[in-house]
A protein has these predicted regions:
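Sec-dependent bacterial lipoprotein signal peptides
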Residues: 1-19
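N-terminal export/targeting and maturation segments
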Residues: 30-78, 86
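Predominantly extracellular/secreted and cell-surface proteins with exposed
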Residues: 75-162
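Edge beta-strand at a domain terminus
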Residues: 165-207
Length: 207
């Protein structure tokens, strides 16, 4: 009798397990799993740094860099990662308008591939030599999908696979640009980077 009860219980468990894994309806059609989506929001502060090695025209180049900052010169940013169970993650960056501190310009960050660190980036302190990616910056409201800028980007993470206390570096080597702008000047190097420093966030919002 005990043997029969054990076999009956085992049979019930097998049936329940099969039903739990079965994604078909009464007609035998396979029902795809419900797609799941979520987003995580991380707040950063932004600071622009640059190094100009051009003895005769350094001040003019520095003034030009200050007059044309990346992402509109914002000091506050929101980095958003949108995840979908059936799609690749979508990375977005919102630059808070410095004039009203409320509205924001949104950009999609498209990874264009891995790149090597450029020698001129060594002029910065804390410049990594590994884990660089080229990113195209595309405005959210664009109609043609064309990037407005391209940066060499790397992220420094104190905690692996976590944005807590992380820093993001958006770097650009502008040496050739300013050599063309000032062809008669001796310009050795012009590099600039936007440094995003972690403030708060990391919460996951299910959509």
């Amino acid at each position: 009798m005990k043997y029969f009860v054990k076999k009956s219980v085992l049979l019930v468990l097998v049936v329940l397990a099969f039903c739990a894994c079965d994604n078909s309806n009464d007609n035998g059609d396979v029902i795809p799993p419900n797609p799941q989506s979520s987003k995580s929001v991380v707040n950063y502060t932004g600071e622009v740094e640059f190094v100009v090695d051009a003895p005769q025209i350094r001040e003019d180049i520095e003034q030009d860099l200050k007059a044309n900052p990346p992402f509109g010169g914002s000091k506050k940013y929101q980095f958003i990662i949108k995840r979908h169970s059936t799609l690749s993650p979508l990375y977005m960056l919102y630059a808070v308008n410095p004039e009203d501190d409320k509205s924001a310009d949104g950009y999609t960050l498209n990874i264009a591939g891995k790149v090597e660190s450029k020698d001129n980036y060594r002029l910065f302190s804390a410049a990594s030599v590994h884990g660089w990616y080229k990113m195209d910056i595309v405005p959210v409201d664009t109609k043609d999908g064309k990037p407005v800028a391209t940066y060499d980007v790397f992220m420094h993470q104190n905690i692996p696979s976590s944005t807590v206390d992380s820093k993001m570096y958006f770097c650009e080597d502008l040496t050739e640009k300013y050599r063309q702008k000032f062809p008669n000047e001796d310009i050795h190097a012009v590099v600039r980077r936007l440094v995003l420093s972690y403030v708060s966030g990391g919460d996951i919002i299910n959509e």
